């Protein structure tokens, strides 16, 4: 009897499970245009007033008791879809901005809570870029610029007019570039020609300044998302922004692109392969040849890129898997040389050769059915570079010049350089990077609302295996510079570990929707001496975004939505290898400089000090952001506006640090040149011991960058009668640059044949505010019947302004020649020596400099031929301009711009 009861219970339980399974529906929601999953879409079953379920991070949802009923699927930025509930169905949502197949040639604001712009392939093709730098024109606040490929191109997000010096380069260093999930690391880049003072060499340096955008080709890119706001805690080692690049995959087309403009020529070739078993392979190469002036063949820049990308997808009833493997080569080559006919037959050159080899792979697996575990992703990436910078100069000296190569503290006689020689200095750098990352996503199945929990960790290693500076110390390229050799491979590797967690919630409240994304990231540097501050703790980054979507409204039978969003968060960028381990400074002080008409009797004696330039108190740069935004959609029209503020008070900068150094001043007046048979001996030669202040450069957290502004974008739907859409975007930026730590300054005044022996310590030495406002009006027309598309863009720069803030003329304290620090007292300005520490900045130094309105008109056109296999495109920037003259004080400033145009040919077979 008991067995029968147990059997009946099991039978009834099984039947209930079967009935429940039959009433449970699992389906997929994707974008109709891109076939990408829609995450967080709400599903409402007929008869219910609130959402029954939300799609997960794979775009899937599961609902019960809905068989045969209608369901309504809705998501911000897409048209509502009402359809019959069916198991294993795929529902496609149509964007309210663009119809299927419609060409969008401008950047679009992302649907995410943080401020971000998405640039699709169509927009890049219409823009006709030569490098990634050209894409920044599409951002709010962006403007077209002539390509400048003879120097590194750094990214500066949300800045008005950045200073040209490197003291505020943390903004570009702190912008992370991620290509197919793998970050591009520049932390081991130490490719700097030491001692160089010529613009020819220094203008091509990119140490501690982030990614050089010239090196990134755009032809393989399928989509770019540039996050200016608060990114996910998944991404770290950044302060200013995030650039996520996704490259093309699949297809079977053979593509070729040829482009020529006023400064460069570009060739691109790519072939895609796609097999039935879901394997894909993409091969591509591109070559760019640029000249700053086409008439000058002595200054060139070349870029070569080769890429092989493979992938495969697997699917079963429970999971969807995706594997990707990328192999990449990138070469970047700068070259400048002088004309021997203008240099007395001597050729002078400067060359750089950057060769980057990269491999990356990723594997992801996602659950199709709803449950606690949703997805897992693992990424492994590595890159290796072989970089050289080489300078050759013909040296002509006018006087006896010493060369010192003592590697330790002490006294020595200098080698006397010949008056004429040819010298070469080379930098050998071999940066290596290894990156690993794992992510796991969980979701708590709760009826009526969507949630996901992201847990992850990443590890990053950077090291440079190069030889460093290679030169002949007795034939220096830059005489009178205290230069020594150091092998870069002897510097320890940087190891950074981070772990993070982030919760994402979408919750319906009445007919509203609340979105919350909050997380925390902890990062720490390892393999570093415990005496360094950065080795003692984890640095937390807390980031939070929230959005509130109001109920859908209806005006004139048209529907619209309004969303308000808010974001706040901190962002951390760790110091680079060059900043943590700067090479020693060498101070060579001349003690005796005896000249004799006979070269064999000359003698220069020097005192050498080896100066440790390491700053163990150096901390990561940290940026605190907040932003408020609104996004309004109505009948295909969209308006978004963002108010933001960013305050980074601990940016990296190089500061002078003074200390006293003693040396001997020999009195050579008693030497009888007529009795010498050898260089004069120092024994018995009278001397005076002198103490003097000398400086060494040290990296500190002394730069503050304050960004404030408004960004906005308005786009219309395409007006069918004229086939035209209007896009208006622009920004107002106000940026303040100043030092956030005290600065030491030694006046150049001379008293009694000596430079002033005191150093003033000032609370401020650099306070500059820049401002700009612009608006771009773009009308793009697409006529499918004629296979013709063109756009006209009126780029209005309403004004730019800069103003230095008042600086303190009187120091807070000062250092005497012995190294003692004294507080500044009232009346010190009357002291015969100390009065030279009082700076004299007149009011004109602080005048606001305003450049008034200017307008550029740009034109682009594309024409498809031969059944879309051939595409001819042309652009002309500054086709027409309005740049009136203006006055700055009493000075008349005349402005003039030149058009810049180009033509390209695209073939698809």
Where are these regions (language model features)?
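A beta-strand signature from Gram-negative outer-membrane beta-barrel systems
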Residues: 91-92, 203-255
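Face-selective signature of the C-terminal outer-membrane beta-barrel domain
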Residues: 314-332, 352-531, 537-541, 552-554, ...
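N-terminal periplasmic "start-of-domain" segments of outer-membrane beta-barrel proteins
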Residues: 42-60, 103-130, 152-156, 192-206, ...
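C-terminal beta-signal and adjacent terminal beta-strands/loops
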Residues: 7, 648-650, 654-656, 796-839, ...
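Extracytoplasmic beta-strand/coil segments of soluble accessory domains associated
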Residues: 133, 137-195
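Structural signature of Gram-negative outer-membrane beta-barrels, strongest in the C-terminal barrel
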Residues: 490-638, 642-647
């Amino acid at each position: 009897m008991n067995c029968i009861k147990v059997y009946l219970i099991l039978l009834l339980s099984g039947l209930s499970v079967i009935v429940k399974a039959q009433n449970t529906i699992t389906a997929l929601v994707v974008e109709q245009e891109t076939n990408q999953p829609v995450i967080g879409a709400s599903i409402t079953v007929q008869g219910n007033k609130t959402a029954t379920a939300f799609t997960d991070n794979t775009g899937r949802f599961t609902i019960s008791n809905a068989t045969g009923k209608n369901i309504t699927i809705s998501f911000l930025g897409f048209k509502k879809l009402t359809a019959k509930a069916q198991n294993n169905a795929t529902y496609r949502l149509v964007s309210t901005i663009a119809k299927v197949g419609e060409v969008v040639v401008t950047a679009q604001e992302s649907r995410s809570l943080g401020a971000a712009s998405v640039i699709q392939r169509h927009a890049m093709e219409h823009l006709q870029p030569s490098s990634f730098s050209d894409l920044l024109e599409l951002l709010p606040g962006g403007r077209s610029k002539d390509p400048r490929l003879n120097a590194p191109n750094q990214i500066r997000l949300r800045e008005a007019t950045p200073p040209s010096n490197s003291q505020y380069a943390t903004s570009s260093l702190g912008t992370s570039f991620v290509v197919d999930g793998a970050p591009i690391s520049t932390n081991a880049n130490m490719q700097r020609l030491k001692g160089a003072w010529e613009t020819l060499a220094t203008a091509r340096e990119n140490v501690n300044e982030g990614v050089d955008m010239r090196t990134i080709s755009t032809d393989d890119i399928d989509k770019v998302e540039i996050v200016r706001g608060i990114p996910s805690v998944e991404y770290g080692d950044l302060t200013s922004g995030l650039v996520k690049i996704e490259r093309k995959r699949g297809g079977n087309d053979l593509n070729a692109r040829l482009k020529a403009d006023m400064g460069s020529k570009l060739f691109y070739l790519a072939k895609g392969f796609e097999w039935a078993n879901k394997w894909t392979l993409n091969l591509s190469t591109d070559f760019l040849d640029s000249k700053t002036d086409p008439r000058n063949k002595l200054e060139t820049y070349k870029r070569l890129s080769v890429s092989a990308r493979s992938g495969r997808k697997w699917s079963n009833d429970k999971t969807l898997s995706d594997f990707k493997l990328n192999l990449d080569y990138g070469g970047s080559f700068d070259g400048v040389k002088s004309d021997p006919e203008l240099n007395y037959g001597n050729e002078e050159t400067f060359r750089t050769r950057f060769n980057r080899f990269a491999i990356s792979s990723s594997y992801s697996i996602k659950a199709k059915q709803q449950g606690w575990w949703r997805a897992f992703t693992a990424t492994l990436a590595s890159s290796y570079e072989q970089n050289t910078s080489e300078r050759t100069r013909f040296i002509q000296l006018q006087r006896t010049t010493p060369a010192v190569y003592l590697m330790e503290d002490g006294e020595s006689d200098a080698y006397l350089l010949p008056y004429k020689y040819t010298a070469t200095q080379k930098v050998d750098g071999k940066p290596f990077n290894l990156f690993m990352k794992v992510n796991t996503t969980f979701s708590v199945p709760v009826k009526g609302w969507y949630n996901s929990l992201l847990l992850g960790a990443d590890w990053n290693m950077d090291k440079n295996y190069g030889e460093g500076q290679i030169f002949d110390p007795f034939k220096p390229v830059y005489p009178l510079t205290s230069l020594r050799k150091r092998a870069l491979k002897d510097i320890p590797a940087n190891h950074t570990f981070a772990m993070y967690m982030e919760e994402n919630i979408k919750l319906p409240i009445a007919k509203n929707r609340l979105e919350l994304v909050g997380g925390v990231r902890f990062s720490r540097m390892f393999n570093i001496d415990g005496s360094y501050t950065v080795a003692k703790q984890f640095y937390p980054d807390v980031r939070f975004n929230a959005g509130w979507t109001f109920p859908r409204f209806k005006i004139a039978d048209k529907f619209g939505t309004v969303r308000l969003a808010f974001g706040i968060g901190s962002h951390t960028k760790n110091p680079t290898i060059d900043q943590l381990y700067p090479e020693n400074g060498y101070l060579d002080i001349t003690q005796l400089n005896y000249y004799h008409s006979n070269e064999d009797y000359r003698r220069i004696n020097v005192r050498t000090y080896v100066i440790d330039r390491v700053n163990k108190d150096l901390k990561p740069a940290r940026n605190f952001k907040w932003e408020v935004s609104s996004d309004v959609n109505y009948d295909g029209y969209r308006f978004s506006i963002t108010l933001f503020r960013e305050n980074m008070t601990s940016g990296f900068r190089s500061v002078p640090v003074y200390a006293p150094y003693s040396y001997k001043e020999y009195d050579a007046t008693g030497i009888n040149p007529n009795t010498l048979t050898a260089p004069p001996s120092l024994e018995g030669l009278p001397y005076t011991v002198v103490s003097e202040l000398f400086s060494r450069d040290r990296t500190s957290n002394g730069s503050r960058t304050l960004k404030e502004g408004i960004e906005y974008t308005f786009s219309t739907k395409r007006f069918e009668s004229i086939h035209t859409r209007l896009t208006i975007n622009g920004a107002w930026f106000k940026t303040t640059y100043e030092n956030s730590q005290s600065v030491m300054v030694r006046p150049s005044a001379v008293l009694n044949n000596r430079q002033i022996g005191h150093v003033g310590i000032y609370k401020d030495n650099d306070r500059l505010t820049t401002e700009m406002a612009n608006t771009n009006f773009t009308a793009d027309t697409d006529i499918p019947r004629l296979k013709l598309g063109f756009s006209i863009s009126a780029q209005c720069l309403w004004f730019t302004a800069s103003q230095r803030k008042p600086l303190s003329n009187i120091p807070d304290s000062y250092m005497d020649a012995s190294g003692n620090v004294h507080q500044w007292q009232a009346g010190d300005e009357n002291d015969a020596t100390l009065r030279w520490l009082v700076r004299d900045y007149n009011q004109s130094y602080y005048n606001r400099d305003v450049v008034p309105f200017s307008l550029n008109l740009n034109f682009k056109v594309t024409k498809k031929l031969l059944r879309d296999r051939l595409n001819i495109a042309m652009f002309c920037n500054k086709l027409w301009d309005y740049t009136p003259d203006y006055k700055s004080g009493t000075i008349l400033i005349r402005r003039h711009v030149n058009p810049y145009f180009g033509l390209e040919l695209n073939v698809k077979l």
